[in-house]
Curated annotation (Swiss-Prot):
InterPro entries: Gp53-like_C (IPR054075). Residues 22-31 have a biased composition (Polar residues). Residues 1-34 are annotated as: Disordered. Residues 1-15 have a biased composition (Basic and acidic residues). This is Uncharacterized protein StfP. Pfam families: Gp53-like_C. To E.coli YfdL and M.jannaschii MJ0347. It comes from Escherichia coli (strain K12). It comes from the Bacteria.
Length: 209
């Protein structure tokens, strides 16, 4: 591409080396800028190349091909990155951006409170799964033969398995009663304390997937 460079171009009109056009001035003997085939060929090919780069063929009767081509070649503000999806090149785009499998993962979900959970998406072998961490505060009832195993229901069910539950006594005052967990399923576990009388509360945290 080039700016007009005929002998009658207005030299440095837009700055050093940036020629422009002049309509001329007969009173001062300044001629109007001449146009040549080099300049018109440049304009033609610059514009036509944009249309053809979009995959379209030139049509003499159409006057919107340049605009149509620009919309096709540039990202649409109405549907950001929609062209990447429609071209079937999402994977290529992620690779070009240097993003790994994690870029495809959904956002983590959670419920916060005294009892709650967080589900963290992970990619394992190209398959999205979730590591789930849950927590709560529940009672373990005592009995004459030692604490009963109270069933505690998880805030949400694990998709595959619960692998561990850790509990601690929710009181620093004596007596401090030992606690145990067991009987893990995807929906619940057993919480048992060592006391033979009373009812004692324990904090717990569970991990699964």
């Amino acid at each position: 591409m080039h700016r007009i460079d005929t002998k009658t171009a207005q030299k440095d009109k837009f700055g050093a080396g940036k020629n422009g056009f002049t309509r001329g001035n007969p009173q001062t003997g300044t001629p109007a800028t001449d146009l040549d085939d080099d300049y018109f060929d440049m304009l033609q090919e610059e514009l036509c190349s944009v249309v053809e780069a979009s995959g379209a063929s030139l049509e003499k009767g159409r006057h919107d091909q340049l605009l149509t081509a620009l919309r096709a070649l540039l990202l649409s503000r109405k549907n950001p990155f929609g062209d990447i999806k429609s071209d079937g090149t999402v994977q290529t785009a992620l690779e070009n951006l240097g993003l790994g499998e994690g870029a495809k993962l959904n956002a983590a979900t959670a419920t916060l409170g005294r009892t709650g959970f967080i589900a963290i998406p992970v990619m394992i072998g190209g398959i999205e799964q979730s590591v789930i961490i849950q927590w709560g505060w529940n009672a373990a009832k005592a009995s004459a033969s030692g604490g009963d195993g109270n069933t505690v229901v998880f805030p949400v069910a694990f998709n595959n398995a619960c692998v561990a539950v850790v509990a601690n006594y929710d009181n620093v005052s004596a007596p401090i009663n030992a606690v145990a967990t067991g009987g893990y399923t995807t929906t619940s576990f057993l919480l048992r304390c060592a006391a033979q009388t009373g009812s004692y509360y324990y904090n717990w945290i569970a991990i699964g997937y």
